[in-house]
Amino acid sequence: MEYSFQKMRWFLVIAIIILITEPLISFGIIEVKAVDNAKTDGLTSNSRATTNQSSLNSTFDGINHVIILVMENKGYPQVIGSSDAPYQNELAKKYASASKYYGVFPESLPNYLSIISGYPYLTKDKDPGTIAPLKEQTIVNLLQSKNMTWKGYFEDIPGVCHLTDAGKSGYIVHHNPFVYFDIRTDDRCKNIVPLDDFYRDLGNGTLPNFSFVVPSNIHNSHDSTVADGDKWLSSFVPRIINSSTFNSTALFVVYDEGQKHDKSGFGSGTYAVNGGRLPLILVSPFAKAGFVTTNEYTHYNLLSTIEAMLGLGNLGKGDTISQPMMDLMRSKS
């Protein structure tokens, strides 16, 4: 009887606490912090909460230019270790790479969207003219808030901010994530330009803080072989390495998704990934030479890394629960 009375007393105490605190929570007098959803989203090991900000600042100090170069539809084993990709393997051996890097969806567009926004807002490859522009934030908003510059460079795009395909193997609009957001409705659209502008900006020393580079469907290995894409990279990447800008640059060579070649992934929930295991190579004087990380990373980690490199903050999506890929960076002496 005494035990039952004590248990009832505790139930009464708990009930009183709930009755008192619930109105206070509702009116914002008591703040309740959300539980970190990294575990439920299957990305516990990538939790950004473990990253020390001062360590980030020190590691990425000196990087003023970040370039993302997106290739197409090839899985990790098709490129890394393959005799069809001698140049990419040369880069991986000289700089830093990831052996467990994954796309987030088995179609192109969601992966491109995720790289610049932290979320695959569209799960099918659609033309932007068929949908209203997305009003969600992207890395462009973060860059603007810091008065930093950006451009999207697209090979064979017929003109600035072009919204339709230009031939089967030329410029493909769903490889251009910027035009799916409200960026296309204002003067920011002028920053979506032909690849020739990249060569000019690089030569003039006027490369923006953030560059997003997409080759044509012939040169990105989508409608061609791994060897064809590797040959194009062997002519493009040296221009960057041999430029005066390279000393303050981080270039990421990455593929969008593995398509039928590799459908592997990991995790569950909102930010699950199933876009296949992909090559990712960091080409930079800041890269840890010859290093291969075995940590599991995704396009969300890539976005998180860009944000950390440029001191941008985050977008509150997949980037927020995904740590920067600091292990690819060499330690400051």
List the model feature ranges, each with a label.
Residues M1-K39:
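Secretory targeting signatures
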Residues F27-G28, V32-S333:
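N-terminal pro-sequences and low-complexity stem/linker regions of secreted or lumenal proteins
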